[in-house]
Design a protein with these regions (language model features):
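Beta-sheet-dominated interaction scaffolds and their linkers
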Residues: 27-58, 129, 354-391, 437, ...
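Short, solvent-exposed loop/turn segments enriched in Ser/Thr/Gly
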Residues: 43-51, 92, 101-110, 378-386, ...
């Protein structure tokens, strides 16, 4: 999910106060530091920082996954350490990498999923992405209209209008001449961008035009800007083209043509719309984007085609030919096409053709749908950390926190209303202090301002026979791998395993026996009959059942 955070560095928000010295129970997994601040990192030079994860419990804990969130649909933070086991009191150092695709301030979260029954620790991740090409410094931390304005200024300031004759001569003889531009031709060679037709052996532009039927395609048709300079001679939207396909394109918008009346070399037209061959779709899209931001959307020409051009831009990204062409034009014209250098700029502009405003996205990712303590000793306080991440692009408000039953369940701090910003996490610490070993079946409820998710109800279980039996899995060193799992997983123990395995949902309802295959101290389980979700697996031995949890993907 997209993460937008163009603001100064700040500490991660903790909803609950830290547990006081009166709380005796261990907190499960702990992390250090609580925040990884990567500083400024270039897109060409990713950086990594260490994170220490410690098991404070008296039983083994397995880290089942490390969850990250995306920035404009792509991950900026990552780690290769996604699954590992920690013995009681043990620590492990993992390295987290920051690889920014965008030159913006990143604010995100890392959440460590585990089977320790004390909640999931989270780590605040912050860093400033920066582009190695200083030409784009003015675009840093900008999006939507502010980014469009920065791109317009960047591509305008210092640029040179060559004039139409010089621009065309440069295109025919240097920029797109495959003998001169590194494409390996031994003679002057041009390729029509729409049909792939080649002109070989021409002597100059006039020769190519007069004797070979080639001319210059204006990707944004010059009719719409009255053939005025500097638009007419801007090389970023000029391409060599044969006369026939150029005429077929005419002033028509780009589109996907389903019933063509003309086709050649992969390009098609129905007389009203024009679809270029695949080799030119991405280039046409980026030329249109550049032109509209550098100048304007004359006569609204881009508006009807922007969506299909965005699709082509994504499907046909810039290649070495595009990058070399961009460099050659920069050497002559002193400006660049930003969508060739950094195609991801498009992710930060909702609309090129009209007023660009990011849609408001309120979204939450609660880490668990059920709070399970396992066994909790009487008169001792055990704390569970319930984490919710704001993975939208606007602040989310929380209100009306409530726990039942009380005083067995209480907030380790305060249950006051609060608000968390995009990229932040709410870490709600819930204390369980039973007076006996009797089962505790409780409920956490709260409200938010997220459409479709205004009310949350999270079941809480402690000393429940089926959930407490999960602890027994650690005492017999029963392990499940992989977890999360697909359609198959392995139960592994120090001794020979025997007995049927049953699956249960989180209410304790039996879902039936699972198919198994015994291989020494391992049991291969078939999970194909389970839908994606979280389940309990019970190995029924002669000494009684032993339970562990699995996440089915």
């Amino acid at each position: 999910m997209q993460k937008f955070a163009f603001r100064p560095l700040r500490a991660a928000l903790f909803f609950a106060l830290l547990v006081s010295s009166g709380f005796a129970a261990a907190q499960g997994l702990t992390v250090s530091p609580a925040q990884l601040n990567f500083g400024t990192v270039l897109e060409t030079q990713p950086d990594s920082l260490p994170l220490s994860v410690t098991n404070t419990l008296t039983r083994t804990v397995t880290v089942t996954d490390i969850r990250f969130y995306t920035t404009y649909g792509a991950p900026a933070f990552s780690t290769p350490y996604r699954w590992f086991t920690l013995a009681p009191g043990a620590s492990n150092t993992i390295w987290v990498k920051f690889s920014p695709r965008h030159n913006i301030y990143h604010n995100s979260e890392l959440v460590i999923e585990n089977d320790g029954l004390r909640g999931y620790p989270h780590v605040d991740l912050v860093g400033q992405g920066r582009y190695s090409n200083a030409y784009y410094d003015s675009t840093e931390n900008k999006s939507e209209e502010a980014l469009k304005t920065a791109i317009k200024s960047t591509t305008t300031n210092g640029s040179i209008s060559l004039g139409y004759n010089i621009a065309r001569d440069s295109m025919f003889m240097l920029i797109d001449n495959q003998r001169r531009n590194g494409q390996g031709a031994t003679q002057n060679t041009l390729e029509s961008v729409y049909t792939g037709q080649l002109v070989v052996g021409y002597t100059d532009r006039t020769d190519a035009q007069t004797n070979y039927g080639f001319n210059t395609e204006h990707t944004f048709p010059q009719t719409y800007f009255n053939s005025l300079e500097p638009m007419k001679s801007d090389l970023h939207h000029l391409f060599p083209c044969d006369d026939i396909s150029n005429g077929q394109r005419g002033n028509n918008p780009f589109a996907e043509v389903t019933s063509p009346t003309w086709s050649d070399g992969g390009s098609t037209s129905d007389g009203f719309r024009f679809e270029p061959r695949d080799a030119h779709k991405g280039r046409a899209a980026r030329a249109m984007f550049f032109f509209t931001l550098r100048y304007q959307n004359y006569n609204g020409f881009l508006t009807s085609q922007e969506n299909v051009l965005r699709n082509w831009h994504a499907a046909f990204p810039p290649d070495a030919i595009d990058r070399a062409r961009n460099e050659a034009i920069f050497a002559l014209q002193r400006n660049r096409n930003p969508f060739i250098d950094y195609p991801q700029f498009i992710d930060r502009i909702t609309s090129i053709s009209t007023l660009s405003t990011a849609p408001v996205l309120r979204s939450l990712d609660p880490m668990q749908d059920t709070i399970i303590y396992g066994s909790v000793l009487p008169a001792a306080t055990t704390v569970y950390t319930f984490v919710v991440v704001n993975n939208g692009n606007t602040a989310v408000s929380f209100s009306n926190f409530n726990l039942t039953p009380t005083p067995v369940l209480s907030f380790a701090g305060t249950g006051a209303d609060t608000t968390i910003g995009p990229g932040d996490a709410l870490a709600l610490q819930i204390a369980c202090t039973p007076s006996t070993m009797s089962a505790v079946n409780g409920l956490l409820t709260f409200n938010t301002n997220v459409p479709g998710s205004t009310s949350f109800s999270v079941p809480i279980y402690a000393n429940d026979p089926i959930f407490s039996a999960i602890d027994e899995a650690d005492r017999v060193n029963l392990r499940l791998y992989p977890n999360p799992a697909g359609d198959a997983a392995w139960l592994i123990a120090d001794n020979i395993l025997s007995g049927p395995v049953y699956a249960y949902d989180l209410t304790g309802r039996s879902l039936g026996q699972l198919p198994t295959q015994q291989l020494g101290n391992r049991l291969q389980l078939s999970l194909a009959g389970l839908a994606p979700g979280c389940y309990l697996l019970g190995l029924h031995t002669n000494a009684g059942p032993v339970f562990t949890r699995v996440v089915k993907e």
